[in-house]
């Protein structure tokens, strides 16, 4: 079984109809099903986020997706001055029920790290990879090296991420191939 990484677009939108997150894998599976079907392309067009998908080459099904967007971690400096550290946020990440426990989630994190590395090397500063995790996914992220935000940092909130647990990983200066 092989997978192709692709940017989600209108040509791939038809594949999203079959995408189905298992109710056992997260607290709100219908949200993730609906996001890839109805919101991902609009978010890309509005500049809100970019969605990457892994497509199973055999079945031509979307095995999983990750949506990335720019954000900042905010901390407080001397004299209560707000300091921001540029970050890349995993805004959405989901794996189809048929492809669970096959390394798809880790591969999607690898895509996010590769994008962060490309941005940092060639376009803009990125210090952290941030995710506001569904409560049922915290252990998954922690196994990959993500930690809870210390009291020094806060994630910018925009309403959608109020009921999640913010986690982050500081990216090393020289990222090599991510291997979970």
Locations of regions flagged by a protein language model:
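Residues forming the Rossmann-fold NAD(P)(H) cofactor-binding site
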Residues: 106
């Amino acid at each position: 079984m092989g997978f192709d990484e692709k940017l989600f677009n209108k040509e791939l939108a038809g594949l999203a109809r079959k995408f189905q997150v298992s109710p056992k894998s997260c607290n709100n599976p219908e949200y993730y099903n609906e996001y890839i079907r109805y919101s991902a392309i609009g978010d890309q067009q509005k500049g809100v986020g970019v969605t990457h998908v892994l497509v199973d080459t055999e079945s031509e099904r979307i095995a999983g997706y990750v949506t990335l967007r720019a954000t900042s971690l905010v901390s407080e400096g001397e004299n209560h001055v707000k300091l921001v550290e540029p970050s890349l946020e995993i805004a959405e990440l989901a794996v189809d029920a048929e492809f669970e426990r096959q390394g798809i989630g880790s591969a999607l994190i690898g895509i996010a790290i590769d994008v962060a590395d490309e941005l940092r090397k060639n376009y803009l500063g990125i210090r952290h990879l941030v995710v506001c995790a569904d409560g049922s996914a915290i252990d998954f992220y922690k196994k990959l090296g993500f930690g809870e935000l210390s009291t020094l940092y806060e994630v910018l909130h925009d309403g959608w991420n109020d009921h999640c647990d913010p986690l982050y990983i500081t990216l090393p200066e020289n990222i090599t191939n991510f291997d979970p």
